[in-house]
Curated annotation (Swiss-Prot):
GO terms for molecular function: proton transmembrane transporter activity. Belongs to the CemA family. The chain crosses the membrane at residues 227-247, 322-342, 369-389, 405-425. Signal peptide: none annotated. This is Proton extrusion protein PxcA. It is a multi-pass membrane protein. Required for H(+) efflux immediately after light irradiation to form a rapid H(+) concentration gradient across the thylakoid membranes. Together with PxcL, contributes to transient H(+) uptake following dark to light transition. InterPro entries: CemA (IPR004282). It comes from Microcystis aeruginosa (strain NIES-843 / IAM M-2473).
Length: 445
């Protein structure tokens, strides 16, 4: 069976995870060793052991940081997977589905080699390339930097992403603190601070601060967009994969012996009967007007029987598909929860990114978005949209349509949503951007 073959493939992939992770960490360590032997006479990749310039050293240091980060991730994966899957045998190679796994001796040799490489690079190595760069290089204008320096900075940032994330979160907290109400308007305080920074006599530090702020903003945008795409793609992919390869085969196998199961609810049954009646009436009509040969009662009965068999299989599959949707959506929610639970740092960055987009919009743009949102979800025509959404959800989960529940939901939920929106406008937006609230009221009138 295809399902058994798929499960065997997944099992084999899981059994090979420790070996695969260790090999990738080992190859990354070999890359670092290659850079050391080729460019640094076999010594540590650092400025004091190099005959190159600052730009070239920054490139090599960024490369090593990337490999060190990869080693760290793969060793973590190796330890976690090895504690779950017992892959290694006692000093002898084992064969698993034709794949020879690594022995304990080979594993220890690779780990010793990795330790000998990463032992040279301590925690302070992450800041070493910045400390040793001359002041003339640090104070160079951003427009005069070459493409190679930009590439090395990008790789250096990706390798030390946690450090940058901490700085972004700290800057976010300081920005949120400025949003608290004070004696003077926030815009006036921000303008005064900007003028003060521009006339600061210590120009070098100001330029470095502006450049650092630009880098943080750029990577904050990249991280936010990637995380938003991850929140969308991971649940959808989980829903489709679990439904196609796991849940649907199990549901079909469970209901295969239950031939009496055809309709999951009364609405589908009425829809099938209505379609069968239309088919019978169409046969009589086409025979009467000469579009088809006139059939006898026995022939009409035979055609109706064939159509009934087709409809029974069609509506049976629709019911099974609805049951599979329930479990697949549960798996999708679990995947979404895992992504959110293990991405607290990314969530902080995304919140700051969205706050920056919202508060940097013009007053008319803010008012336009508020009116658009309210008209779609709580406006005069919104009940029709909510009704379509509820009917679609009922079909998706195979639930019978309940008009009373739909009317009750439409009568209460948009009202609650409208109340929350008005409270947000009164409590927060009125304090942060009073002119946007005034523009919203004028546009609404």
């Amino acid at each position: 069976m295809n399902l058994n073959r798929i499960l065997q493939g997944v099992n084999q992939w899981l059994l090979q995870t420790p070996e695969r992770s260790l090999d990738e960490a080992y190859h990354a360590a070999l890359k670092i060793k290659e850079i050391e032997d080729k460019h640094f006479q076999g010594r540590k990749v650092a400025n004091e052991f190099s005959n190159y310039g600052s730009s070239t050293n920054s490139y090599f240091i960024a490369e090593v940081k990337g490999y060190l980060q990869k080693i760290k991730v793969r060793l973590t994966e190796f330890k976690a997977s090895r504690s779950i899957v017992n892959t290694f045998g006692p000093n002898q190679p084992t064969i698993n589905n034709g794949v020879i796994t690594v022995t304990t001796d080979v594993c220890l040799k690779k780990l010793q080699f990795i330790d000998s490489i990463i032992g040279k690079y301590q925690d302070n190595y992450w800041q070493e390339d910045i400390q040793d760069v001359p002041k003339s290089i640090q104070n160079r204008n951003f427009e005069q930097e070459t493409a190679k320096n930009k590439t090395s900075r990008n790789r250096s940032f990706l390798a030390a992403g946690s450090i940058e994330d901490e700085e972004i979160i700290k800057s976010n907290k300081s920005q949120k603190a400025t949003e608290k109400p004070g004696v003077l308007p926030r815009s006036f305080v921000n303008t005064f601070n900007r003028i003060k920074q521009e006339i600061d006599p210590q120009a070098e530090e100001s330029e470095e601060a502006v450049l650092k702020k630009f880098r943080n903003s750029r990577y904050k945008t990249a991280i936010s967009l990637k995380f938003i795409l991850l929140l969308i793609i991971v649940p959808l992919l989980t829903q489709q994969l679990t439904k196609t390869f796991l849940i649907t085969p199990l549901v079909n196998k469970y209901f295969q012996q239950q031939e009496q199961f055809i309709f999951i609810n009364q609405d589908l049954e009425e829809e099938a009967f209505s379609e069968l009646r239309r088919f019978e009436e169409a046969l009589h009509f086409r025979g009467m007007i000469g579009l088809a040969p006139k059939l006898s009662n026995e022939e009409i009965e035979g055609e109706i029987t064939k159509k009934a068999a087709v409809l029974s299989e069609e509506f049976r599959q629709r019911g099974l598909n609805a049951i599979a949707n329930i479990f697949a959506d549960i798996c999708s929610l679990i995947a979404f929860g895992f992504v959110v639970a293990f991405s607290r740092r990314e969530i902080e960055i995304v919140k700051s990114f969205l706050d920056g987009i919202l508060y940097n919009l013009s007053d008319s743009a803010k008012a336009f978005l508020i009116i658009l949102f309210t008209d779609i979800f709580v406006g005069f025509h919104s009940p029709h949209g909510w009704e379509v959404i509820l009917e679609g959800l009922s079909r998706h989960f195979g639930l019978p349509e309940n008009r009373q529940f739909n009317f009750l939901f439409i009568a209460t939920f948009p009202v609650i949503l409208d109340t929350v929106l008005k409270y947000w406008i009164f409590r927060y937006l009125n304090r942060i951007s009073p002119s946007a609230v005034a523009t919203y009221r004028n546009m609404n009138e």
